[in-house]
Design a protein with these regions (language model features):
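N-terminal helix-turn-helix DNA-binding module of bacterial transcription factors
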Residues: 1-58
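Bacterial carbohydrate/catabolite-sensing allosteric modules
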Residues: 42-43, 48-50, 70, 74-75, ...
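A short, well-structured beta->alpha microelement
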Residues: 104-121
Length: 341
């Protein structure tokens, strides 16, 4: 009945639904249809039929109650403000369902902060999940409360933490150094940075690269922002007002770079076309004009390892905090060129 209900909601066949949900290597030709199928599956709290799968494989049947994991977006009030976390969230939902788990509540920083102010509401939520997945850098003051409420925690981010819980990271510092080294190899010396500067690994990678190449750290080229598309556009407007313009711009994430492109398309100064590079490799980075050169952060793999760490801990396979670090990768497209100065 579950597959039929999902097929009805998504407007497709049961066989297509089954392939999307139960075959990890299946690639749906229609991305929008695939998104509808996963959304419908989450709406009805679908989990794969393990009994049917074990019967087919000949393995003994074991009745289990699906594990539920809440997901906490730690830095933004909405997924729309950072498309990296939006895509990571989609990968997580798929991975949870593939591992016969159920996505629980989706929490944001304003919601959790409000719960803490009400004191008792956080500890008496109507359902208690088996664990929680943190998306992004969690405020230090929330860690002890989360650890008291959730026995199993895993974090996913570009920055490592010193907190005592499992985490899957792709080093923001390494990603930033990779981006900066590429710009410098193209002859760029005046490189602006747009992004968070507060204990931020990508900012550390930015200035470390300048120092290692004996380039001056010009604070007038550093623009602290909250790393949204809107902030990227506003910051680029400020840059365009300068007399001396940077030849290249390093954005801490793709969302910021999209805002930079928005601004350049509206207010491009004659003859000024800066090289732009960023971090994340979101889907939209392939659709920009010019196509965005970026650093790939392996979102699907991060989601996969995060769920595995939670299940491993729940099954008492490890007790110490584990950190898995995945490599980043330079994706060269069209938005960077040799410096003409």
């Amino acid at each position: 009945m579950s597959l039929k209900e999902i097929a009805h909601r998504a407007g497709t066949s049961v066989s297509t639904v089954s392939r999307v949900l139960n075959q990890p290597d299946y690639k749906c030709k229609n991305p929008e249809l695939e998104a509808c199928i996963w959304a419908a599956a989450q709406e009805i709290s679908y989990t794969p039929n393990t009994a049917a799968q074990t019967l087919k494989s000949g393995a003994p049947q074991i009745k289990t109650t699906p594990l539920t994991f809440d997901i906490f977006l730690t830095r933004f009030p909405s997924l729309s403000q950072d498309l990296f976390f939006s895509e990571l969230f989609e990968s997580l939902k798929k991975e949870l369902l593939r591992q016969q788990c159920v996505p629980g509540k989706f929490l944001t920083l304003p919601e959790v902060t409000s719960m803490l102010k009400e004191k008792s509401s956080f500890s008496v939520t109507d359902t208690h999940a088996d664990g929680i997945i943190l998306l992004g850098k969690c405020p230090a003051e929330l860690i002890s409360t989360l650890q008291n409420h959730y026995h199993n925690i895993v974090g996913i981010d570009r920055n490592p933490t010193n907190f005592d819980y499992d985490e899957v990271i792709c080093s923001g510092t390494t990603a930033a150094v990779t981006a900066m080294n590429y710009l410098i190899s193209l002859g760029h010396k005046k490189i602006a940075y747009i992004g968070d500067c507060s204990y931020e690994a990508r900012y550390i990678g930015y200035y470390q690269s300048l120092i290692s190449h004996n380039l001056p750290l010009d604070y007038s080229n550093i623009y602290p922002t909250s790393q949204t598309r809107e902030e990227g556009m506003k910051t680029m407007e400020l840059i365009l007002q300068r007399e001396e313009l940077p030849s290249a711009i390093f954005c801490a994430n793709d969302s910021t770079a999209l805002g930079v492109f928005d601004c350049l398309q509206r207010h491009r100064k004659k003859g000024y076309i800066p090289s732009v590079i960023s971090i994340d490799n979101i889907l939209e980075s392939e659709q920009t004009k010019p196509m965005l050169t970026t650093i790939d952060i392996p979102k699907k793999e991060m989601a996969h390892h995060a769920v595995n760490l939670l299940l491993d801990r729940i099954h008492n396979q490890h007790s110490n905090a584990v950190r898995i670090e995945l490599p980043c990768r330079l994706i060269v497209r069209e938005s960077c060129s040799y410096c003409g100065r």
